[in-house]
Amino acid sequence: VLRLLPAVDVANGLAVTHRTSAGGDAGAGISALDACLRWVEAGADWIHLVDLDAAFGRGSNAALLAQVIADLARLHPGVSVQWSGGVSSADDVERALAAGAKRVNLGAGALKDLAATTALVRRFGRHLNVCLDVSAASAAPSPAAPADPAPSGAAQLAGAQRGAAQPATQPSADLATYVVHPRGQGGPVGPLEPILAALNEAGTGAYVVTDRVRDGALSGPNLPLLGTLSGATSAQVIASGGVSCAGDIAALQDLAASHPNLCGVILGKALYTGQIDLKALLRP
């Protein structure tokens, strides 16, 4: 089953309804706890909680994130939090885990020191996800047309699953054409393939994979990249970026049928624009 992780991005002490690819605030700020509760009350059992200021090197909301996690644990003890944004060291990971996060995303910028990253992987095991923010090595790939934004919700998802004309074999991507390029600070880290090989050898438990071109663009997930990368690792893979409607989620579920380690998808902008109805999708 593909887990749906609604994202709550926090900047300047407030949750922003969506953000630009450069991390800029693109919507009115609301209480971070209220934003989380909105998705929990819609049925979410995981929250992807992001410190945008830490991710883009302009401050920290760590104390607020810790308070939000504590409040969620008190109000909804069955909900888990995935902490993301600006995590680059053992101290960062320990702080997030001590605050009650179940999983912590290590930022792609940490991959500049691959030896240190593999040491963190071995130390924190299943509690650590490694972010792979990637872009094409030469020219950016053209985003695929998004799935038809037909009525959102369970009916749309079921219809997409029944009627989508999926190819028998999903198209593949050439991982050699991608580089790891963090969305926060700094330029490209290096080619994806050798980095992935080193992380696999270290025993990485999960990757969060984001195609930078699609992040926040509502242009559909990069299915060839996700399928090929899932086939190149035994680790869990969480898709991030581009999801625009329930049809995109159905396409990811189809892909997960042949790549069972593709286990989750982070939902962002489409939730806040109303293009995805989380409550309807999670309804039994």
Please report, for each region that a protein language model flagged, where it lies by residue.
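Short, well-ordered coil/turn segments that N-cap beta-strands
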Residues: 1-4, 44-46, 77-81, 101-102, ...
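Conserved, mostly hydrophobic/aromatic
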Residues: 9, 39, 47, 96, ...
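Conserved anion-binding
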Residues: 10-23, 101-149, 153, 158-163, ...
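Glycine/Thr-rich beta-alpha phosphate-binding loop at enzyme active sites
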Residues: 16-70, 134-138, 173-231, 273-276
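Catalytic beta/alpha-barrel core
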Residues: 47-53, 80-89, 102-113, 131, ...
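Alpha-helix-loop-beta-strand connector modules within alpha/beta enzyme cores
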Residues: 58-82, 120-133, 220-238, 242-246
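Catalytic cores of alpha/beta
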Residues: 81-102, 224-260, 276, 281
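C-terminal helical cap(s) of enzyme catalytic domains, especially alpha/beta-barrels
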Residues: 116-123, 253-258, 262-284
